[in-house]
Amino acid sequence: MCIRDSERTGTKGEVSHTQDLGFYRVKYPVQGKPLVSVIIPNKDEKETLQTCLEMLEKNTVYQNFEIIIVENNSTTDEIFRYYKELSGNRKIHLLRWGKEFNYSAINNFAAAHAKGEYLLFLNNDVKSINPDWLEEMLGVCQRPEVGGVGAKLIYPDNTIQHAGCVIGMGGIAGHMFVDMPADRTGYLHKASLLQDMSAVTAACLLMKKEVFEQAGGFTEELAV
């Protein structure tokens, strides 16, 4: 049924079974080779940042991206030595944010300097599990009805940190399935399925740059 619907709508997708009977996974192929601007705010965290950059280089199939590191008031000599090491990498650009910390403003600042058609907002402590992670997110984000794509995030103890957000949960918004074992699929298997969400976290968020600009970027009154 999923295959027929894909053919009927003219949407290309690779349909496969999941471990749950009656539920399917659709992987949308990337159209063309658009540039993705990966935006990573950073303060002092040399080893954390290095691990993230190595993940992008060695454990990411889709490689047409630039990396924008936003240096945010670091104080350690170690991180500035590392920035100097990175200066020879043509994919990496370093911006300096000299004002007080404001997560929204920092990312808006970087987005204004981005050359990519797509923006990937990425925390420096995120590591990929599957090499095709960016390719898969981009395939979904290219769909005309999609403005942004989030990711399932897992804590080091193999429990869920984020599998989408629900507006109104816990007052303003809350993460679904927090602290549930990552190998569990949850209510109606929603913890393991591609689906529409009220919101997603910007810890790993891919957006069309055009949509981000139309929305006015992040609200800078919300600093964190």
Where are these regions (language model features)?
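Conserved small/polar residues in nucleotide/adenosyl-binding loops
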Residues: 1-6
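Donor nucleotide-sugar recognition loop
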Residues: 127, 194-224
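N-proximal low-complexity "stem/linker" segments adjacent to membrane-targeting elements
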Residues: 8-58
